[in-house]
Amino acid sequence: MLRDEVAVSARTLQWKCVESRADSKRLYYGRFILSPLMKGQADTIGIAMRRALLGEIEGTCITRAKSEKIPHEYSTIVGIEESVHEILMNLKEIVLRSNLYGTRDASICVKGPGYVTAQDIISPPSVEIVDTTQHIASLTEPVDFCIGLQIESNRGYRMKTPNNAQKGSYPIDAVFMPVRNANHSIHSYGNGNENQEILFLEIWTNGSLTPKEALYEASRNLIDLFIPFLHAEEQDQNLKDNQKNGVTLPFFTFHDGFDKLKKNKKEIELKCIFIDQSELPSRTYNCLKRANIHTLLDLLNKSQEDLMKIEHFRIEDVKQILDIIQKHFVVIDLPKNKFLIGNPSE
């Protein structure tokens, strides 16, 4: 009943992009409206959306530089105009776009004289440099400029700490937020009805994604936060039915399937198959992500018992995951009835 009411009330609401522009490679702007809203709803949505845009969207950046030849962060190197600290600040500003999870290694190796720019970064295929002209260093003499880099995807902002420093390795303040700023304003609907409002939402991004993409990601993250409330009654009923029928969920691990996968002729690189390639429903996808399950390898290393410990995860989700893996990768041959919920005697 609740979902029906939500669907009916949402039919009259309309999103519209009223302005979109790219001021530079690293500055995109978009303005959107949502209307008509009842009085008070615009502020509720605007505040929640701004928080989600600034804090809930993942971004990618350089989080560490490595070189055994650098004595300390505030040193200078012969033949390089900038100090090490200035180079680290320039690396902090590099804007990256990627679909990676966790950390990856990259590097720069250039011989002077000349300029070192973002174009000189040797990165994994899953990482794209948004603006290859971003300046890193100026080499005034024929010196070798070779450093290792660590690239990471995450959310929010992370300050470097003294405890995070290692010899020859220099942490960088990480700004993972792809949304630079977000504002909302509320206006009268203009039909003489003071109880109806229009929400205007302005979004500025760093170029790693468009304002429209940011709006989609923020909306999806907010929806995922509220989905458990919509399913609460349904989950309670499933639990009562299972207890009533005396059903014991079968213990199953993905290791059998993993063994077959390793023997597959195609030798699929499990680490390169991300769960977002498998067309999982957004709720299941986000449950797995929050449990640090990002690739097919991560998934196949989990047992059903492990998966059922994930918050908001259900036995139906396990069955659905298996069905999708069988459909797309055709490597696991297990009887589907092991996952059916109900009275075994039926």
Swiss-Prot record:
Protein name: DNA-directed RNA polymerase subunit alpha
Extent of the signal sequence: none
Pfam short name (any one): RNA_pol_L
Catalytic activity: RNA(n) + a ribonucleoside 5'-triphosphate = RNA(n+1) + diphosphate
Region spans: Alpha C-terminal domain (alpha-CTD): 268-346
Primary location class: plastid
Cellular compartments annotated: Plastid, Chloroplast
Stated family: Belongs to the RNA polymerase alpha chain family.
Gene3D superfamilies: 5' to 3' exonuclease, C-terminal subdomain (1.10.150.20), DNA-directed RNA polymerase, insert domain (2.170.120.12), RNA polymerase, RBP11-like subunit (3.30.1360.10)
GO-annotated molecular function: DNA binding; DNA-directed RNA polymerase activity; protein dimerization activity
Domain notes: The N-terminal domain is essential for RNAP assembly and basal transcription, whereas the C-terminal domain is involved in interaction with transcriptional regulators and with upstream promoter elements.
Enzyme superclass (EC): transferase
Alpha N-terminal domain (alpha-NTD): annotated segments: 1-233
Record's GO cellular component terms: chloroplast; DNA-directed RNA polymerase complex; mitochondrion
NCBIfam families per UniProt: rpoA
Organism (species): Ranunculus macranthus
UniProt keyword terms in alphabetical order: Chloroplast, DNA-directed RNA polymerase, Nucleotidyltransferase, Plastid, Transcription, Transferase
One GO BP: DNA-templated transcription
Function: DNA-dependent RNA polymerase catalyzes the transcription of DNA into RNA using the four ribonucleoside triphosphates as substrates.
Record bears the keyword Transferase: yes
Quaternary structure and partners: In plastids the minimal PEP RNA polymerase catalytic core is composed of four subunits: alpha, beta, beta', and beta''. When a (nuclear-encoded) sigma factor is associated with the core the holoenzyme is formed, which can initiate transcription.
